[in-house]
From Swiss-Prot:
Name by which UniProt lists this protein: Regulator of telomere elongation helicase 1 homolog
GO CC aspect terms: nucleus
Comp. bias regions, Polar residues: 882-892
Function: A probable ATP-dependent DNA helicase implicated in DNA repair and the maintenance of genomic stability. Acts as an anti-recombinase to counteract toxic recombination and limit crossover during meiosis. Regulates meiotic recombination and crossover homeostasis by physically dissociating strand invasion events and thereby promotes noncrossover repair by meiotic synthesis dependent strand annealing (SDSA) as well as disassembly of D loop recombination intermediates.
Length: 994
C-alpha cells in the first residue's frame, strides 16, 4: 500500500492525472512527463531525448507509475484478483482476466549498474512502495559456491538446473519451502531492492536470490532488466517473460538500434558443429549404458522394485530418449555436410575487401531445410539439445572438461536465433498476437533484412558462418506481436533522431528533442578547423601526416593550458590514439626544446590513458581523479564507444572539457559495416521501399555522430555543471545542425586553435569563483566516498563466510589483507603520512615511500633504499579480512632496519638508486595481458608465502628484462625488506643494467 504521508510535489499533467514528483519539476521535466502520459493514453510509442542532468529517469518512472496507478484505480477488482493469484503467475490466471490487467512496466537499461541507479532514483520517489523486482543472471545472483566457481554463464545455468532438479541446492530448497506470506514479509520493505539487496537477503536467510527475484517478477508491477532479456528471443524464452499488455521502457536507448540488430543475428563455426556431434555421441553412449544397467538391475530384482528403478532412471534423464538423440545427430551430420557444400557453391559471392563470401539470408534457410531443419521441429530439437547438455553436465566425474556441452549449446542458440527472430507481416494482418513459430518465419522477409557471410580459415579449413540482421525494426515488431502495449525509448543522445525513429519502425505518437533545464546552457562548443600548420582533417589517410599529427598536438596543448581541473579527450579508435600518442612521444614540441609533445602535455596536466582491459580501468580512474584534485588538473585519453564514453559518471571537476579528436566512423573494413552498407545500397535500388530510406553514407555518418554525441554528454551531468566541448576536426564544420543534440546547437562556433584557446580561457575566467568552490567540494566528496567505500569493504569482509579470497591486482600492494610485522622503532621520526582520500579506488603505489626516503637522506641515515611505507612493512600473508584486521593504524616511526654488510646507499649503483625510486604504480603500465597474469600469480604466491624471493626473481625476469630492466629492479619494492636486499644483490650479480 502507498504511504499516507507525502513530501512530494503534486504535478497535474492533464485534468485526469497528477504525478507525485520528489521536487518542483523544471519545465523540461513537465514536457517530458506530458509526452509520456499522452502516448500511454493513446496506446502509442515514444522517442524521448532529454539532456543529461534533466532528471530523465525520475521523469520516466514517476509519469509511467502514476499512469499505471490510475489504471489500477479504474480496475481495482481485476488487479486485486491478479495479485492474489499466487506464485503460479500468468500460467495460473484465466486469459480473459489477464487481458484486463493493468500494464506491467518492463524497465530496461544496458547494464546492471545502470539499473541499480534506477533503483536508487525510484527510492527517492513516492512510488518506491510499488512491487518491484530486478532480473539478472546467476552470475550476479547465485550464492551457491558450486555454481559461483563456474565462469561460463551457460554452464552455471545447467549446473544450477541439475542441482535444483536433484534437490541438492540448500538455498533453492529453503526458498521452495518458504510460504507466500513469509516471502512477502522478506521482500515487502516499503522500497525497491537492487541485486545487492537480494543477495544480502538471500545470504542472511539461506534463500536463493535468483529464484526469489524471478518468482517476484510473476506478480511485480515494475520489472527492471537488461536490454537483451527483452530483445533476445532466446532470453525471453528462458525467463518466460509475459509481455502481453505491458509497457516497455528502454532507457539509454542510443545504442538500441545496433543492439537489436546484434540480438537478431547469429554465428556458428564448423568447429562447434563438429564438437556438437562428438558431444551427442558421448551422450548416446552414456545413455545406452545407463539404460542397459537399469534393465539388468531391474531383471535381478522383483517386479515392483525393478519398475521403480526403471522409473528412477527415466526421471533422471527426464525426456531424453535415444531415438530423439539419433534423429538430432543425423540432422547435425547433414548440417555439417550442407555448410561445406554451401561455401563452394555459386550462390555465395566475394565481397571485397573481405576475405569471405556473402549472400542474402534466404540462402541460409534453404541450406538448413536441406539438412532437415524447419520451423515446425526446431523447438523440439533445441529442447533435446538442452536436455542432453544437462545430462552431460550431471556426469561430472565421468566426462572430460572438454565435453561439457559447448558445441550443443552453440548449435542450439544458432538455430533458435534463426527460427524465432523474424516476424511475418501476415501475423499482424490476421490480428494474432501469439503466432506459432512456423508462421513467424518468412524467407522473403529474411532475405530483405539479413545477409549471410561465410569465411574459411586458410590454415585449418574452419568455416565461420555469420548471419547478420540489418533491420532493428524486426526486433521491435516482434515485441509488438507479443502484445507489448507501449514502447518508450529514452536517452540523453538520440540525435540524429529522425533516422533513429525511422529505423526503429515503431508507431511513434511522440518524438521529443527536449531543451535543457537551463535556458542558457553553460557550455561553450568550439569546432577547431585549423591549427598552426594547416587544416585539421583527421581522415584515415591523414593520420600519419606529420603536419596533421603535430597540428593536433599543438592545438591540444593550447587548450589544455587554459582548461582547469579535468579534461576528457576522446579519439576515434584505440589505433588512432596509439598512433598519435606514439608520434607525440618522439616528436619535439619546439625547435628550441628537447621535450617531446607528450612530455610537454605531462607537465601541463597529469595524463592518463584508458586501458583496453576492463579490469585495469579502476586503477586508471584513480590516477585521473587524483590528478584532477592537483593544482594543474588531469587529462584522460579515451576512445569513443569505449569504457569511458558512457557508463561512468564524470561530474563537475572531472569533466570541465570534452575534446574529440577526429570523427569516430565505424571501421570501414569491418564485416558488419561492409555488409550493412551493401544491404542499404541494395534497399536504395529497390522500387518497393519507402521514400525516407537511408543511404549507406547517411547511416555511416549517423553512426559516427551518435558516438560523438554520447561522448559530448559527459560534459554536463546536472543543472549546476558547466564546461566546454572542443571538436578538433575540420569536417565537423560541414555537419548539419540536426546531427547534434538540440540543446547543444546554439552553443557551437568555429575557430582556429588560437581563437578556441582565447574563448575557452575567457569562459573559465568568468566562472573562476565556481571553479574554486568546486575544488573544495570535490576534495570533500572524494574523501566522503573513500570513507564510505572502506566501510563497505570492511563490512563485506567481516560478513564473508568464505575461506578463499580473490586477490586483484589492485589489492596486491594494499595493506588491507597483510599482517603487520613487528619491528623495533628508531628514535628519529619521519613526517606523518596521511592516506590519500581522493578516490574510492585503491591503486598500488609507493609514492609515500619516496617521501620517507627523502626524510632519511636529510637525516643522514645510511641504508639501502627507503624505509617501507605501511604497505611494505607488512608480511605478505593472506588472511580472511575480519574486524580485527580491517583497520590498521599507520605508524609514524620507520622500523629499525637489519644491518646489510654488502650493500649500502653508497655502494648501490646510481642506475639502481634511480630505478627503486620508480613508483610501483608504473609496474603494470603497458604490460601485456599474459605478463599481467604471470605477474599477478607470482605476487599472490609470494604473499601467501608459497614461493621464495628467488623464485619471484626468476619469474619476473622474463617479464621485464631486457627492455624494462629498470622496472625489474623497481619490483624489489614489492618484496619484504629482508628479501628486497637479496633481490637487488642477485640483480647486480646477474649484471642486469638499465
Amino acid at each position: 500500500m502507498p504511504p499516507k504521508a507525502s513530501n512530494s510535489t503534486e504535478v497535474w499533467i492533464n485534468p485526469k492525472l497528477s504525478v507525485k514528483f520528489p521536487f518542483e519539476p523544471y519545465e523540461c521535466q513537465r514536457i517530458f512527463m506530458k509526452n509520456v502520459v499522452d502516448v500511454l493514453d493513446r496506446k502509442l510509442d515514444a522517442a524521448l531525448e532529454s539532456p543529461t542532468g534533466t532528471g530523465k529517469t525520475l521523469s520516466l518512472l514517476c509519469s509511467t507509475l502514476a499512469w499505471v496507478q490510475r489504471q489500477k484505480e479504474t480496475k481495482p477488482l481485476d488487479f486485486a484478483t491478479w495479485q492474489t493469484s499466487g506464485a503460479g503467475g500468468a500460467e495460473k490466471t484465466d486469459e480473459k482476466l489477464k487481458s484486463a490487467y493493468v500494464p506491467t512496466i518492463f524497465y530496461a537499461s544496458r547494464t546492471h549498474s545502470q539499473l541499480e541507479q534506477v533503483v536508487h532514483e525510484l527510492n527517492r520517489t513516492e512510488y518506491k512502495w510499488v512491487k518491484t523486482t530486478i532480473l539478472g543472471s546467476r552470475e550476479h545472483f547465485c550464492i551457491n559456491q558450486k555454481v559461483k566457481k563456474i565462469k561460463e554463464s551457460n554452464r552455471q545455468a545447467h549446473v544450477c538446473r541439475g542441482l535444483v532438479s536433484k534437490r541438492a541446492c540448500h538455498y533453492y530448497n529453503k526458498f521452495d519451502a518458504c510460504t507466500t506470506d513469509k516471502m512477502t514479509e522478506f521482500l515487502d520493505k516499503g522500497e525497491a531492492m537492487d541485486i545487492e539487496d537480494f543477495v544480502k537477503l538471500g545470504t542472511q536467510n539461506s534463500l536463493c536470490p535468483y529464484f526469489m527475484s524471478r518468482q517476484r517478477s510473476e506478480t511485480a508491477e515494475l520489472i527492471l532488466l537488461p536490454y537483451n532479456y527483452i530483445i533476445d528471443p532466446k532470453m525471453r524464452r528462458r525467463y518466460k517473460l509475459d509481455l502481453k499488455n505491458s509497457i516497455v521502457i528502454f532507457d539509454e536507448a542510443h545504442n538500441l538500434e545496433s543492439i537489436c540488430e546484434s540480438n537478431a543475428s547469429a554465428e556458428l563455426t564448423s568447429t562447434s558443429i563438429a564438437l556438437c556431434i562428438e558431444e551427442l555421441k558421448k551422450v548416446l553412449a552414456l545413455l545406452v549404458d545407463e539404460e542397459e544397467t537399469a534393465r539388468s538391475e531391474a531383471d535381478a530384482e522383483t517386479g515392483a522394485f525393478g519398475s521403480a528403478k526403471i522409473d528412477l532412471t527415466k526421471k533422471l534423464i527426464e525426456n531424453l530418449r535415444t531415438e530423439d538423440l539419433m534423429t538430432v545427430l543425423e540432422k547435425i551430420f547433414s548440417l555439417e555436410e550442407e555448410m561445406d557444400k554451401l561455401f563452394g557453391s555459386s550462390q555465395l559471392k566475394s565481397v571485397p575487401p573481405l576475405s569471405g563470401k556473402a549472400s542474402d539470408g534466404e540462402i541460409l534457410l534453404e541450406t538448413l531445410a536441406k539438412a532437415g531443419f524447419d520451423a515446425n521441429s526446431v523447438e523440439r530439437l533445441v529442447d533435446v539439445l538442452r536436455d542432453a547438455i544437462s545430462y552431460l553436465l550431471s556426469k561430472n566425474e565421468e566426462v572430460a572438461l572438454t565435453e561439457k556441452g559447448d558445441g550443443m549449446e552453440k548449435v542450439a542458440d544458432f538455430l533458435l536465433s534463426i527460427y524465432s527472430t523474424h516476424a511475418q507481416d501476415v501475423a499482424a494482418a490476421v490480428g494474432e498476437e501469439t503466432v506459432k513459430l512456423v508462421d513467424r518465419v518468412d524467407p522473403k522477409t529474411v532475405a530483405r533484412n539479413c545477409k549471410l557471410y561465410i569465411q574459411k580459415d586458410k590454415d585449418n579449413e574452419k568455416l565461420t558462418i555469420k548471419y547478420f540482421c540489418f533491420q532493428a525494426s524486426i526486433s521491435m515488431r516482434m515485441l509488438k506481436m507479443r502484445g507489448v502495449r507501449n514502447v518508450l525509448l529514452a536517452s540523453g543522445t538520440l540525435s540524429p533522431i529522425q533516422a533513429f525513429t525511422y529505423n526503429m519502425g515503431l508507431n511513434f505518437g511522440a518524438i521529443l528533442e527536449n531543451e535543457h533545464a537551463l535556458k542558457q546552457v553553460p557550455v561553450l562548443t568550439s569546432i577547431v578547423t585549423r591549427g598552426k600548420r594547416g587544416g585539421l582533417a583527421g581522415s584515415f589517410q591523414n593520420r600519419k601526416n606529420l603536419d596533421y599529427v603535430t597540428g593536433v598536438a599543438e592545438a591540444l596543448l593550447r587548450v589544455m593550458e587554459v582548461i582547469p581541473q579535468g579534461i576528457l579527450i576522446f579519439f576515434s579508435s584505440y589505433s588512432q590514439m596509439d598512433e598519435l600518442v606514439a608520434t607525440w612521444k618522439t616528436t619535439k614540441w619546439s625547435s628550441n626544446s628537447n621535450e617531446s609533445f607528450w612530455e610537454k602535455m605531462e607537465k601541463t596536466k597529469r595524463v592518463v590513458v584508458e586501458p583496453r582491459a576492463k579490469e585495469e580501468l579502476a586503477a586508471i580512474r584513480l590516477r585521473y581523479t587524483q590528478g584532477v584534485s592537483e593544482q594543474h588538473g588531469a587529462a584522460l585519453l579515451a576512445v569513443c564507444r569505449g569504457k569511458v564514453s558512457e557508463g561512468i559518471d564524470f561530474c563537475d571537476a572531472e569533466s570541465r572539457a570534452v575534446i574529440i579528436i577526429g570523427i569516430p566512423y565505424p571501421p570501414i573494413h569491418d564485416e558488419r559495416v561492409v555488409l550493412k552498407k551493401m544491404y542499404l545500397d541494395d534497399l536504395m535500388g529497390r522500387k518497393d521501399t519507402k521514400s525516407e530510406r537511408q543511404s549507406s553514407q547517411d547511416w555511416y555518418q549517423m553512426e559516427a555522430f551518435r558516438a560523438v554525441n554520447q561522448a559530448i554528454g559527459r560534459v554536463l551531468r546536472h543543472k549546476d555543471d558547466f564546461g566546454t566541448v572542443v571538436l578538433m576536426d575540420t569536417r565537423y564544420a560541414s555537419a548539419k545542425p540536426e546531427m547534434f543534440p538540440k540543446w547543444l546547437r546554439n552553443t557551437i562556433s568555429r575557430s582556429d586553435t588560437d581563437g578556441c584557446a582565447l574563448k575557452t580561457s575567457r569562459f573559465f575566467k568568468e566562472r573562476g569563483h565556481l571553479i574554486e568552490n568546486s575544488k573544495t567540494e570535490y576534495i570533500k566528496k572524494q574523501a566522503k566516498q573513500c570513507k564510505s567505500f572502506r566501510q563497505v569493504k570492511q563490512t563485506a569482509a567481516s560478513d564473508s563466510k568464505d575461506d578463499i579470497i580473490e586477490i586483484t591486482l589492485e589489492d596486491m600492494f594494499s595493506p588491507a589483507n597483510m599482517k603487520l610485522e613487528k619491528k623495533e622503532i628508531t628514535k628519529l621520526r619521519p613526517p606523518q603520512l596521511i592516506p590519500s582520500t581522493s578516490s574510492v579506488f585503491s591503486l598500488p603505489t609507493n609514492e609515500d615511500e619516496l617521501k620517507i626516503k627523502k626524510w632519511e637522506q636529510e637525516n643522514d641515515i645510511q641504508c639501502l633504499s627507503s624505509i617501507p611505507l605501511e604497505s611494505n612493512k607488512r608480511k605478505f600473508k593472506i588472511e580472511t579480512p575480519g574486524p580485527s584486521t580491517s583497520t590498521l593504524t599507520q605508524k609514524s616511526e620507520p622500523p629499525k632496519k637489519k644491518k646489510i654488510l654488502l650493500l649500502t646507499r653508497n655502494t648501490l649503483p646510481d642506475e639502481y638508486q634511480k630505478a627503486i625510486e620508480i613508483p610501483t604504480s608504473e609496474l603494470l603500465k603497458d604490460m601485456s595481458d599474459d605478463n599481467k597474469k604471470q605477474f599477478a600469480t607470482t605476487l599472490r604466491s609470494y604473499k601467501a608465502e608459497s614461493i621464495r624471493w628467488d623464485e619471484v626473481f626468476q619469474r619476473f625476469r622474463p617479464i621485464f628484462v631486457p627492455h624494462k630492466a629498470d622496472l625489474f629492479i623497481a619490483c624489489s619494492n614489492v618484496l619484504r625488506s629482508e628479501d628486497k636486499m637479496k633481490y637487488l644483490k642477485k640483480a647486480l650479480e646477474s649484471k642486469i643494467h638499465t
